[in-house]
């Protein structure tokens, strides 16, 4: 039976009452709201109190409080992180050292030095000052390579790789190195009539092919194909991601990385890892005694004092990156500096061409006798160190005396090569390209040349420095023997190729457009 009108109104009234809070409910809700608001206000107050206390402690009570530096950097790590992510960190350090002096507090618990007196304590102490793990890249297979391994493993790696990077090893590998450099000259000759070339690209191709042959038993084929191998092309993206990854790790948010990292980057890293593994497995299948870096190293199970497969993978990646980037970066920077200083270029060209009667005389041994070339490369290394930031170390328990001042245990310290080598405290006319400073010129007698340590010092100095020097000398000598060089000014524009570069662990090099005019020889052979 249908409800009457009175019954319908009564039902509607009861339904609406469901949404009308009773007096008790209102009181309860007010109580909860007040509690939430009070908790929020208390949280904000606690955060504000913690912030003020932290700021006060770091500025006025912290053991590093007496060291000079910008207040914001002393208060928080955020300005440092911002600088690294933006790629301006090297230039920022240079600016800060010019403003505050030879030692600067660049973070609440970190000091930066630009004086050679700090080098010995930081990099040559016994026991060693450990590397700061927050400044190291993550390892894709969980096994640190030679760049990040603990002392006992680092010593073992160096011992196993020592022969391959020694003078004797270099001479044994000379035919391999020479073959790639001759191919570089051939390819440059073939392309020189097509307009200006990006010389950065060609240097990269040559040095990657050489180190690929030495580290993996075969080159990347860059010079043969005149194009960049996929593995090499991905390096820039991976390296640029390291400062961001390290910033996230510093806040103990490692779990966030897979969630926010671009899928393209994650896939790229996975492909790179697989590529390296395949190359190592291929090298293992060939056995020992191939005349490359792995002779005497291989020990797949890691039971005979050699390297396990996982260690070979980690070290293979590190060797390829360090062994190629160092040489190609310096050659690029040196070429730019020579083109900006035509008198130096002319003198070096005359030096090379006057030292040989035929290109066949130019080899690893003969170029080692070119004193002016050595001075040119040393000066380029000073102004444009391929690894512009030295590794950071942590002061051992008990503290240390660095550059005449006490530094407490746990402090992160480093000597900044770029800032140190451009300091007027260390070099006369520091921003000028003057190779004569390395040739006993009396004008530069007071230069503190030991400041320039582009390959670091101590037990962890660059094991491949002899290879890098040999490559740089031989490549530069061959190019100056065969070609006259000229900057493509219209294509480059007014920009300063060197000073405009950002740094994400390595220099972010833009194209350097150069015209190469083949030299006309009256006789050859």
Swiss-Prot record:
Keyword Metal-binding recorded: yes
Leading EC class: oxidoreductase
The EC number(s) this enzyme carries: 1.14.14.116
Catalytic activity: (1'S)-averantin + reduced [NADPH--hemoprotein reductase] + O2 = (1'S,5'R)-5'-hydroxyaverantin + oxidized [NADPH--hemoprotein reductase] + H2O; (1'S)-averantin + reduced [NADPH--hemoprotein reductase] + O2 = (1'S,5'S)-5'-hydroxyaverantin + oxidized [NADPH--hemoprotein reductase] + H2O + H(+)
Gene Ontology molecular-function annotations: averantin hydroxylase activity; heme binding; iron ion binding; monooxygenase activity
Main localization, broad class: membrane
Keywords: Glycoprotein, Heme, Iron, Membrane, Metal-binding, Monooxygenase, Oxidoreductase, Transmembrane, Transmembrane helix
GO CC annotation terms, alphabetical: membrane
Residues bound to heme: 462
Gene3D superfamilies: Cytochrome P450 (1.10.630.10)
Recorded topology in the membrane: Single-pass membrane protein
Transmembrane segments: 36-56
Cofactor(s) it depends on: heme
Sites carrying sugar chains: 315
Family: Belongs to the cytochrome P450 family.
Protein name, UniProt field: Averantin hydroxylase
Organism the protein comes from: Dothistroma septosporum (strain NZE10 / CBS 128990) (Red band needle blight fungus)
Gene (UniProt): avnA
């Amino acid at each position: 039976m249908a409800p009457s009108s009175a019954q319908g109104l009564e039902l509607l009234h009861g339904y609406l009452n469901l949404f009308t809070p009773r007096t008790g409910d209102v009181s309860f809700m007010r109580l909860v709201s007040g509690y939430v608001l009070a908790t929020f206000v208390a949280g904000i107050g606690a955060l504000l109190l913690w912030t003020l206390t932290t700021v006060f402690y770091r500025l006025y009570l912290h053991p590093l409080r007496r060291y000079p530096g910008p207040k914001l950097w002393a208060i928080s790590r955020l300005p440092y992180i911002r600088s690294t992510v933006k790629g301006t960190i090297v230039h920022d350090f240079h600016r800060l050292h010019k403003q505050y002096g030879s030692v600067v507090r660049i973070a609440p618990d970190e000091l930066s030095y630009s004086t050679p007196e700090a080098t010995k304590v930081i990099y040559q102490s016994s026991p060693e000052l450990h590397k700061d793990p927050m400044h190291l890249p993550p390892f894709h297979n969980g096994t640190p390579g030679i760049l990040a391994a603990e002392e006992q493993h680092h010593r073992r790696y160096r011992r196993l790789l020592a022969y391959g990077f020694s003078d004797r090893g270099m001479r044994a590998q000379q035919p391999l190195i020479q073959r790639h450099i001759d191919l570089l000259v051939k390819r440059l000759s073939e392309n020189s009539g097509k307009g200006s070339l990006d010389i950065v690209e060609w240097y990269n191709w040559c040095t990657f092919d050489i180190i690929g042959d030495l580290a993996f038993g075969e080159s990347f084929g860059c010079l043969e194909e005149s194009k960049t191998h996929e593995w090499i092309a991905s390096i820039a993206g991976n390296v640029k991601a390291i400062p961001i990854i390290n910033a996230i790790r510093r806040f103990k948010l490692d779990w966030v990385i897979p969630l926010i990292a671009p899928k393209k980057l994650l896939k790229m890293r996975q492909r790179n890892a697989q590529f390296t593994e395949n190359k190592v497995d291929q090298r293992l299948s060939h056995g020992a005694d191939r005349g490359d870096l792995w002779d005497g190293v291989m020990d797949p199970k890691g039971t005979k004092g050699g390297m396990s497969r996982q260690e070979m993978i980690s070290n293979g990646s590190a060797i390829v990156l360090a062994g190629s980037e160092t040489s190609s970066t310096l050659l690029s920077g040196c070429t730019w500096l020579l083109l900006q200083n035509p008198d130096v270029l002319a003198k070096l060209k005359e030096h090379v061409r006057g030292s040989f009667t035929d290109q066949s005389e130019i080899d690893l041994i003969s170029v080692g006798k070119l004193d002016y070339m050595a001075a040119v490369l040393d000066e380029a290394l000073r102004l444009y160190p391929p690894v512009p930031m030295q590794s950071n170390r942590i002061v051992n328990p008990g503290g240390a005396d660095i550059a005449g001042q006490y530094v407490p245990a746990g402090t992160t310290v480093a000597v900044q090569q770029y800032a140190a080598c451009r300091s007027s405290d260390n070099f006369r006319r520091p921003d000028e390209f003057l190779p004569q400073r390395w040739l006993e010129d009396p004008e530069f007698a007071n230069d503190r040349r030991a400041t320039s340590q582009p390959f670091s010092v101590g037990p962890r100095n660059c094991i491949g420095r002899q290879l890098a020097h040999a490559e740089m000398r031989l490549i530069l000598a061959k190019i100056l023997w065969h070609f006259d060089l000229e900057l493509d000014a219209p294509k480059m524009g007014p920009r300063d190729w060197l000073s405009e570069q950002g740094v994400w662990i390595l220099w972010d090099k833009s194209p350097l457009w150069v015209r190469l005019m083949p030299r006309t020889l009256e006789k050859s052979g």
